[in-house]
């Protein structure tokens, strides 16, 4: 084994959280940091990861995607479902859909009601959302103007179907909101995106690491696959990893910071002897510390596509044609504008399916084309679709180690749709979506319903459609829950219970999945914990208003 090297901090995983920590910790010039990433660099010449409109490409193949699969999901016709996770500098921010959604204020207020998580209320989190962000139209009480992450807002003159979707939501009785990340998430409005002013994907590798990698106190090792965290007694003291087939070792003087994400973080903990002792003994792994919650509490968002043909030739369908792509690519490459510079998710909605929901439980992404997320099975016609999914399923799954081999995939079971409420929400989701698309705003555009199709009406027919066609939104989280109690893995600052010198900092900490996409909340969480690691005072709590429904009906009579 090569000579061990020593650093103050070792960060495992250069994803949305790990890159934040690497950048913030190395702002202190007397601190040395090693950042380990199992994937490769984020090649800036590769349009597949850099062009927002090409977001389907990195999900195909395994250069940038671990491309995990779930175990057969018992409530989903035993389908093995996709579980894509980013591989390379930027992690999943290198391959995600680039939607900049923070979640609902009440998500965080409800986290803060759990024992030990009092510091995670919305007004304590908002300053860290702002700290991380540069919004293209400037800062305000809810948005930042000088953070590492570029956020682009939709502009006038974009595809008319985006505005049509918002108008139809209003006609169906729902509110319009100017900013789903501002005062009021609930309603229909524009969707911001992680895209730079030059039309490039704003991954955390670009936003954070581009600054930090110039610093002499940061060492970045790519293609470095972590094997185990090493302990002396109950203290984490280093990491064993493999690089180009060679075993290597590094020691941490202060802390090991595990930022592998909701799949890899519990997997690495278990391989290192931290977790459910029964599971570890089955694999012959010596138990360093019993923590039965490692890998439990796994959550995700499921979603479906409700697709229609478009009667007017204004959808993005022509952009799929090979003969149109060179022009689109050239405009993006040289000007940073045009169809290539957008992820195409430019309007969205957050609604309550029933009056007794305290805050939105359904999310819409609207797309002016009919296609699946990974770019397959495009409808050969002008079309549009609404992606819809429930936000806070009570179903819980788990991540379980299958082998001591660091290259082996874990066993992943989300246990999707395990509760009766899941089925109620998805039936509501399909019926409410049809109601929205049936509004007068869509009359000029709405053609035949492609999917689920007009024949799918009864509860049983809708349930079968969900079983066969619902897909992951790629939002796994919760598998190393922060908090107190037997099943919590860390405290509110990511410190692993019962151990020293070890934190988990990523989406696996979320006790309950937020209402929306997970990249922005993951960056916020890492910014907040970075201050704790550095011994800095938390940023002062924000003092802004935010919308709470307080029993108002979910929709007004139209």
Swiss-Prot record:
Alphabetical UniProt keywords: FAD, Flavoprotein, NAD, Oxidoreductase
Instruction: Name the residues that bind FAD.
Output: 8-37
PROSITE patterns tied to this protein: GMC_OXRED_1, GMC_OXRED_2
Q: Which InterPro entries match?
A: BetA, FAD/NAD-bd_sf, GMC_OxRdtase, GMC_OxRdtase_N, GMC_OxRtase_C
**One of the GO biological process terms:** glycine betaine biosynthetic process from choline
GO MF assignments:
betaine-aldehyde dehydrogenase (NAD+) activity; choline dehydrogenase activity; flavin adenine dinucleotide binding
Q: Which pathway does the protein contribute to?
A: Amine and polyamine biosynthesis; betaine biosynthesis via choline pathway; betaine aldehyde from choline (cytochrome c reductase route): step 1/1
Q: Looking at the keywords, is Transmembrane helix present? A: no
Give the protein's recorded name. Oxygen-dependent choline dehydrogenase
Q: State the organism of origin.
A: Chromohalobacter salexigens (strain ATCC BAA-138 / DSM 3043 / CIP 106854 / NCIMB 13768 / 1H11)
What taxonomic lineage is listed for the species of origin? Answer: Bacteria, Pseudomonadati, Pseudomonadota, Gammaproteobacteria, Oceanospirillales
């Amino acid at each position: 084994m090569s000579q061990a090297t020593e650093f103050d901090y070792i960060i495992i995983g250069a994803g949305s959280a790990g890159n934040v920590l690497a950048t913030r910790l190395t702002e202190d010039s007397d601190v040395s940091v090693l950042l380990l990433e199992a994937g490769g660099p984020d090649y800036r010449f590769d349009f597949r990861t850099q062009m927002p409109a090409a977001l389907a490409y990195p999900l195909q193949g395994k250069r940038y995607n671990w491309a995990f699969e779930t175990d057969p999901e018992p409530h989903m016709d035993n389908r093995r479902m996709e579980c894509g996770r980013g591989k390379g500098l930027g992690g999943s921010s290198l391959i995600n859909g680039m939607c900049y959604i923070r979640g609902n204020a009440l998500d965080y207020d409800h986290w803060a009601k759990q024992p030990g998580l009092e510091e995670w209320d919305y007004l304590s989190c908002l300053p860290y959302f702002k700290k991380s962000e540069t919004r293209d139209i400037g800062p305000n009480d809810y948005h930042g103007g000088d953070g590492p992450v570029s956020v682009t807002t939709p502009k006038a003159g974009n595809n008319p179907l985006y505005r049509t979707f918002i108008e139809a939501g209003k006609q169906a009785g729902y509110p319009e909101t100017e900013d789903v990340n501002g005062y009021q998430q609930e309603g229909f409005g524009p969707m911001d995106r992680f895209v730079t002013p030059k039309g490039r994907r704003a991954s955390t590798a670009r936003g954070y690491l581009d600054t930090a990698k110039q610093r002499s106190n940061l060492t970045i090792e790519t293609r470095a696959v972590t094997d185990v965290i090493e302990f002396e007694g109950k203290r984490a003291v280093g990491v064993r990893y493999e690089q180009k087939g060679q075993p290597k070792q590094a020691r941490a003087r202060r802390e090991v910071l595990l930022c592998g994400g909701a799949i890899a973080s519990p997997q690495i903990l278990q391989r290192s002897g931290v977790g459910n002792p029964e599971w570890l003994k089955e694999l012959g792994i010596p138990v360093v510390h019993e923590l039965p919650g490692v890998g439990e509490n796994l959550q995700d968002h499921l979603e479906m596509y409700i697709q229609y043909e478009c009667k007017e030739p204004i959808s993005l369908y022509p952009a799929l044609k090979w003969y149109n792509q060179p022009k689109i690519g050239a405009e993006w490459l040289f000007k940073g504008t045009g169809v290539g510079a957008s992820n195409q998710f430019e309007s969205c909605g957050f609604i309550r399916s029933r009056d007794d929901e305290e805050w939105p439980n359904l999310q819409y992404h609207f797309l002016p084309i009919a296609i699946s997320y990974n770019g397959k099975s495009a409808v050969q016609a002008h079309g549009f679709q609404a992606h819809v999914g429930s936000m806070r399923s009570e179903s819980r799954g788990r991540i379980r180690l299958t082998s001591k081999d660091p290259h082996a995939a874990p066993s992943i079971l989300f246990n999707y749709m395990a509760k009766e409420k899941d089925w109620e929400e998805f039936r509501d989701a399909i019926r409410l979506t049809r109601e929205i698309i049936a509004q007068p705003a869509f009359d000029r555009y709405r053609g035949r319903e492609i999917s689920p199709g007009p024949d799918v009406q009864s509860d049983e027919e809708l349930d079968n459609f969900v079983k066969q066609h619902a897909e992951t939104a790629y939002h796994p989280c919760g598998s190393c829950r922060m908090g107190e109690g037997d099943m919590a893995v860390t405290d509110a600052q990511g410190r692993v219970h019962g151990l020293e010198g070890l934190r988990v900092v990523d989406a696996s900490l979320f006790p309950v999945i937020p209402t929306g996409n997970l990249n922005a909340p993951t960056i916020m969480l890492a910014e907040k914990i970075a201050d704790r690691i550095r011994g800095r005072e938390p940023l002062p709590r924000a003092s802004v208003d935010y919308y709470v429904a307080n029993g108002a009906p979910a929709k007004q009579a139209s």
